[in-house]
């Protein structure tokens, strides 16, 4: 009887530990961030397609500033990459990213219509691409704060990430 009581106590402690671990690891953790600048002239097809969609009213992304008189030689695409790790027991689903506060020169964010998920115990990358007008002073300024939103086990989780 004493051995059975000890086994029940050990099982209870192990179960409580597993529950506490699961609660504490619901939110994915940010492992790494990066910003990559690509001149719009070097990806002219993407730029031209985006301008056409803006003119037709079919652009599905988020517009921050004036889209008038966009020229490839005056713009650059900044791709923000956030690497996340999901240490929890449940997958992180419907992951999305957006700029918290666009800066001067940010024109729009390209649409991302895919459904992103991060399986339990895995690592994955999320990307957000922003078109910005470039000039000599602001060209090197890629620091932004991104808001990541996801759902884990039906619970909405929102956190901010700084990318330099």
Model-derived regions, located:
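Asparagine-centered strand-capping/turn motif at beta-strand->loop junctions
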Residues: 76-91
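Terminal connector regions
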Residues: 134-164
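Intrinsically disordered, low-complexity Pro/Gly/Ser/Thr-rich segments with frequent PxxP/GP/PP motifs
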Residues: 106-136
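Short extracytoplasmic
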Residues: 39-77
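Membrane engagement elements in two modes
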Residues: 1-55
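Hydrophobic core residues within well-ordered beta-strands of beta-rich domains
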Residues: 78-80, 124, 144
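Short acidic, flexible loop segments centered on an aromatic residue
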Residues: 87-105
């Amino acid at each position: 009887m004493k051995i059975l009581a000890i086994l029940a106590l050990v099982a209870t402690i192990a179960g409580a530990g597993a529950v506490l671990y699961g609660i504490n690891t619901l939110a994915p953790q940010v492992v790494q961030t990066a910003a990559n600048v690509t001149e719009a002239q070097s990806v002219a097809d993407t730029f031209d397609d985006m301008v056409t969609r803006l003119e037709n009213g079919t652009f599905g992304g988020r517009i921050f500033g004036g889209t008038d008189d966009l020229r490839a030689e005056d713009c650059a695409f900044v791709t923000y990459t956030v690497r996340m790790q999901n240490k929890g027991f449940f997958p992180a689903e419907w992951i999305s990213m957006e700029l918290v506060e666009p800066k001067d020169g940010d024109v729009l964010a390209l649409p991302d219509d895919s459904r992103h998920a991060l399986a339990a115990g895995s690592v994955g990358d999320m990307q957000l691409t922003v078109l910005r007008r470039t000039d000599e002073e602001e060209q090197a300024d890629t620091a932004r704060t991104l808001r990541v939103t996801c759902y884990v086990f039906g619970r909405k989780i929102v956190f901010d990430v700084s990318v330099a």
